[in-house]
Design a protein with these regions (language model features):
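Active-site beta->alpha loop and helix N-cap motifs at the rims of alpha/beta catalytic domains
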Residues: 2-14, 19-22, 27-34, 38-99, ...
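Catalytic cores of alpha/beta
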Residues: 12-19, 68-70, 96, 116-124, ...
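Glycine-rich phosphate-binding active-site loops on the catalytic face of alpha/beta enzymes
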Residues: 29-32, 111, 128-139, 181-201
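Alpha-helix-loop-beta-strand connector modules within alpha/beta enzyme cores
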Residues: 44-55, 94-105, 143-163, 209-212
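Bateman (tandem CBS) regulatory domains
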Residues: 78-80, 216-228, 280-293
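The conserved cystathionine-beta-synthase
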Residues: 230-247, 254, 273, 294-315, ...
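Short hydrophobic beta-strand motif reused across regulatory alpha/beta modules
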Residues: 262-267, 315, 320, 326-334
Length: 338
């Protein structure tokens, strides 16, 4: 199934065609007007340099006017083998279609709302017939049934015509296009970008990134520049200042040689206040019971830190280098996405 972009926004057109596999671009005078385009010919020539196939409007009230407009645009320097002229369905439109096809042009008969209209376009040799699914559904019609009938007519009678599913409003419409077997679908960029999205895919991808990170990055890579330490001769108030300034929930208590001898956490503070009241912040850290904190060397992989956190059932490890405290690693540091 051919995949076209439906747009006149030059920036998103450039972005979309970086995908490298889109068939082409469909656009309309309405799109151009919406984006403030006044130099239609200049825009057409610019777009023709970007996209593999360009589908543009050839408007006129009579077959002669439609043919003349297609010839005028062709004379701008467009590649006839890479340009499709869009014509609204009408008696004059299908008459112009036949003449243009005989002259070697490709034609898209669009604004199709009935099978009878599609039949006239196919009979006229239209390269594309384009039912507008979203608009039809807005009016309460069985748009998918119409598209299915158009596909079946092409297949049954052997018309050299591709059915284009257009007026796409959501990702479900693209699924519908695949299910009914259309030859072509044209999709707005905001919807096309959603076609690869899935919640479970994102969960799996995040896990892959997380686990790869654990096996390839060292603990030192994630601890940052802040090193929340206080010496043992300081007070609880001093420890709180360090915790607050660094945005941490804990500080490492070190001796004079920067070796870790304990850890003080916001949880410890809450327990002390609950037990002894607010005056505890003036206490010296040496007055508190201390035990050697669990540490990991900065050169170790995050995988090792994760294993320690699980084994010891703690949320934070002191990070050391040659036995000296250089930072902290928290369980949240291990699940940050790359």
């Amino acid at each position: 199934m051919e995949l076209y972009l439906d747009s006149a926004d030059i920036n998103e057109i450039k972005e979309a065609f970086e995908l490298g596999f889109l068939t082409g671009l469909t656009t309309t005078p309405t799109f151009m007007h919406r984006h403030g385009i006044t130099d239609i010919d200049g825009t057409i020539l610019e777009l023709a340099k970007i996209v593999p196939v360009l589908q543009i409007e050839a408007l006129g009230e009579t077959a002669d006017e439609i043919v003349a407009e297609a010839e005028r645009q062709d004379a701008l320097g467009l590649d006839r083998g890479k340009t499709v002229y869009k014509i609204p369905i009408s008696v004059e439109g299908v008459k112009a279609c036949r003449r243009l096809v005989d002259m070697g042009y490709m034609v898209n008969i669009h604004l199709v709302y009935t099978l009878q209209q599609a039949y006239m376009a196919m009979s006229a040799g239209a390269s594309y017939v384009c039912p507008l699914v979203g608009r039809l559904q807005d009016q309460g019609h069985d748009a998918l049934g119409l598209v299915q009938q158009c596909v079946e007519a092409v297949n049954y009678y052997g018309y050299d015509t591709r059915i284009m599913f257009s007026s796409v409003r959501n990702v479900e419409h693209v699924k519908n296009a695949l299910n009914v077997g259309v030859h072509t679908v044209t999709v707005p960029w905001k919807i096309m970008k959603k076609l690869t999205e899935n919640h479970f895919t994102q969960i799996g991808t995040d896990e892959f990134f997380e686990h790869t990170r654990l096996m390839t990055e060292s603990v030192k890579d994630v601890i940052g520049a802040n090193n929340p330490v206080v010496t043992s001769d300081k007070s609880i108030a001093d420890a709180l200042v360090v915790m607050t300034q660094g945005g941490f929930g804990a500080v490492t208590i070190v001796d004079g040689a920067q070796r870790p001898i304990g850890m003080f956490t916001d949880g410890d503070l809450r327990r002390l206040i609950s037990k002894d009241g607010g005056n505890v912040i003036d206490k010296a850290l040496t007055d508190l019971p201390m035990k050697q904190p669990i540490s990991v060397e900065g050169m170790e992989l995050l995988y090792t830190a994760e294993a320690l956190l699980r084994e010891k059932e703690v949320d934070t490890l002191v990070v050391t280098e040659d036995g000296k405290a250089i930072g902290m690693v928290d369980v949240q540091d291990l699940i940050k996405k790359s």
